[in-house]
From Swiss-Prot:
Record PANTHER family: DIHYDROOROTATE DEHYDROGENASE (QUINONE), MITOCHONDRIAL (PTHR48109:SF4), DIHYDROOROTATE DEHYDROGENASE (QUINONE), MITOCHONDRIAL-RELATED (PTHR48109)
Molecular function terms from GO: dihydroorotate dehydrogenase (quinone) activity
Membrane topology: Peripheral membrane protein
Similarity section: Belongs to the dihydroorotate dehydrogenase family. Type 2 subfamily.
Name of the encoding gene: pyrD
Annotated organism of origin: Pseudomonas syringae pv. tomato (strain ATCC BAA-871 / DC3000)
Protein name: Dihydroorotate dehydrogenase (quinone)
């Protein structure tokens, strides 16, 4: 059924089909119809960040930026749902067109630029949702906020999202906000992590609960840079790392229509690059911090490969666009079929 729907949706522009799909998933959630597609999603409980996940396969941020279809996505069988990226103030993002499909490569290039309705709007939608499962809220900075003041934007979003999130993801790796990726390195990263950790402690006291913080990183780092990031995350006491965001590389899409468009590349071509980052992180973190793997999962076995590389959870986005809800069950089943390691 999804193959037919995809054929129809792919006749529309990528952003139009994205918006229509979000509307349909949201409507299905309100009517309770999406469970007909996701009812067979397996249970494979896992405890990560002190949270109990019904299965380790989640929706990556970016598909539902404003929390418009939380209930709908949850009913499809995801073990957790991450919404955003959201910024303190609403912003329109980059000019259209800004999403491009590369179906021959099972890939997408986007340069959305954190288009969203603002954190206050997102919080109101979370409050209106019926979903009580694991919800991540992904936060970023406004386009016109100078990088040297980015910490302020993250703290504003953290303050407002904290009480409504199971965990909060700090996005310092989108390639579509100028200067953002510089926050992954050196003193900029250290200062950001210190500020977030301190505010997390304050909010824990204020709300009587500790909400874990995850940092989402890029796939375009060297091994040496990845090792330094891992050390900074451990030192600051962050709770998890998400590996990875989209890539600036065009390996695997050379010569394809739209392959040279500006923006972040996601889908199958980023898989090996992202999985390599997971492996490097796993070696450095040595179990001290969980890894959430995202990037290039288009078949169930790819999810299992991420777990084998050292991840505790996985997320899908582009693969969901190309394969539909069936990919959720396939990914859970593939992980469940993995050989058990002695503890």
């Amino acid at each position: 059924m999804y193959n037919l729907a995809r054929q129809l949706l792919f006749k529309l522009s990528p952003e139009t089909s994205h918006d229509l799909s979000l509307d349909l998933i949201g409507a299905g959630g309100r009517l309770g119809l999406n469970g007909l597609l996701g009812k067979s999603a397996a249970k494979l409980p896992v405890s990560v960040m002190g949270l109990e996940f019904p299965n380790p396969v989640g929706l990556a941020a970016g598909l539902d930026k404003n929390g418009a279809a939380i209930d709908g996505f949850a009913q499809l069988g995801f073990g957790f749902v991450e919404i955003g990226t959201v910024t303190p103030r609403p912003q329109p993002g980059n000019p259209k067109p800004r999403i491009f499909r590369l179906p021959n490569a099972e890939a997408i290039i986007n340069r959305m630029g954190f288009n969203n309705l603002g954190v206050d709007n997102l919080v109101s939608r979370v409050e209106a949702a019926k979903y009580r499962g694991i919800l991540g809220i992904n936060i970023g900075k406004n386009f016109d906020t100078p990088v040297e003041r980015a910490v302020d934007d993250y703290l504003i979003c953290l303050d407002k999202a904290y009480a409504h999130a199971s965990y909060v993801t700090v996005n310092v790796s989108s390639p579509n906000t100028p200067g953002l990726r510089s926050l992954q390195f050196g003193d900029s990263l250290k200062q950001l992590l210190e500020a977030l950790s301190l505010r997390q402690q304050e909010l824990t006291q204020r709300h009587g609960k500790r909400v874990p913080l995850a940092i989402k990183i890029a796939p375009d780092m060297t091994d040496e840079e990845t090792v330094l990031v891992a050390a900074a995350l451990i030192e600051s006491g962050m709770d998890a790392v998400i590996a990875t965001n989209t890539t600036l590389s065009r390996q695997g899409v050379e010569g394809l229509p739209h392959g040279d468009e500006a923006g972040g590349l996601s889908g199958a071509p980023v898989r090996e690059k992202s999985t390599h980052i997971v492996k490097v992180l796993a070696g450095e973190l040595a179990g001290r911090m969980p890894i959430i793997a995202a990037g290039g999962i288009t078949e169930g076995r790819h999810a299992a490969e991420k777990i084998a590389a050292g991840a505790s959870l996985v997320q899908i986005y582009s693969g969901f666009i190309y394969k539909g809800p069936a990919l959720i069950r396939q990914s859970v089943d593939a992980i469940a079929a993995m050989p058990r390691t002695a503890s």
